Amino acid sequence: MESLKEMRKAQMSEGPAAILAIGTATPNNVYMQADYPDYYFRMTKSEHMTELKDKFRTLCEKSMIRKRHMCFSEEFLKANPEVSKHMGKSLNARQDIAVVETPRLGNEAAVKAIKEWGQPKSSITHLIFCSSAGVDMPGADYQLTRILGLNPSVKRMMVYQQGCYAGGTVLRLAKDLAENNKGSRVLVVCSELTAPTFRGPSPDAVDSLVGQALFADGAAALVVGADPDSSIERALYYLVSASQMLLPDSDGAIEGHIREEGLTVHLKKDVPALFSANIDTPLVEAFKPLGISDWNSIFWIAHPGGPAILDQIEEKLGLKEDKLRASKHVMSEYGNMSSSCVLFVLDEMRSRSLQDGKSTTGEGLDWGVLFGFGPGLTVETVVLRSVPIEA
């Protein structure tokens, strides 16, 4: 028994998991939000729906978004007209693009993360790949392993259909892997596309317009490991704790269903109110061990699900106007990229902290929170510790 305890102890790291590198990628096709209503209704042959187009234009104007990136091209939509219909039977066409583009975009982000990390990709021991697009067997984790040229013995985990909160999920999983497998280095990749969800408008499904106004494509990758070797590695953030919570009375608030028509997403109007009404519970539980209850004393990495969610979080917690600056910037420049979005915010936080001459990667603060929100309603809460920025 003693030898088993020794073996178990030998497998565990000495310290907490750390984020060692971040990389991001977006498709080349850029759509300006101001022009998108005209483009969307033209491509879906819905210009006769003038009242619906006015509603959509209002949604876009209030979205906080300046531009978005999507893998869909005008040529693809013209060649696959069923995709542009509201409920056209188009799953095959969507799958054909998603199973290729999901790992390809993820690879772009992973290459950047590994380059920043500075170590050989053969040192990657685990791979977590997350996406709500292109369900296939073998999955995007397998495809990325081949494209990137990872060791064939890399331990893979594929996380499908979790939605917008999963940026926090993959960090929680990576933390557990890194801290319980001494010397491991975990490559985390979130790659999300609108290929499954893009569809034309319908007067009978106004809630679908919200997703069409907000969602975008993007991939983010991280390298996570415990006990970084300071001679060759540098921590960006430490993952102090990670938890998940289902919010009460939120059944059916956000749902997604795979059908012959693709992935249909349904959003209830009270989603922002449900999040804001319950957000203090996971916050209090996460920061109670640290004795922190002033939410303006920490830095914020919040999934920018939409402007209403961010506004209500600010109001509920009494956050200063600049607290969600990183989230609002990512929402403006990229839109809602589902699970990868909060990792873009993390990258923006460290980059902006450096550019602004702050003393830490958390805007000069030591402690921070990463929030993922999504179907369930589910909240992922990750407590972060920043690191000093060397002058």
From Swiss-Prot:
Top-level taxon of the source organism: Eukaryota
Principal EC category: transferase
Reaction(s) catalysed by this chain's protein: N-methylanthraniloyl-CoA + 3 malonyl-CoA + 3 H(+) = 1,3-dihydroxy-N-methylacridone + 3 CO2 + 4 CoA + H2O
Catalytic site: C164
Pfam families, sorted: Chal_sti_synt_C, Chal_sti_synt_N
The keyword Isomerase belongs to this UniProt entry's keyword annotation: no
Keyword Nucleotide-binding listed: no
PANTHER family: CHALCONE SYNTHASE, HYDROXYMETHYLGLUTARYL-COA SYNTHASE
Homology family: Belongs to the thiolase-like superfamily. Chalcone/stilbene synthases family.
Protein's name according to its UniProt entry: Probable acridone synthase 4
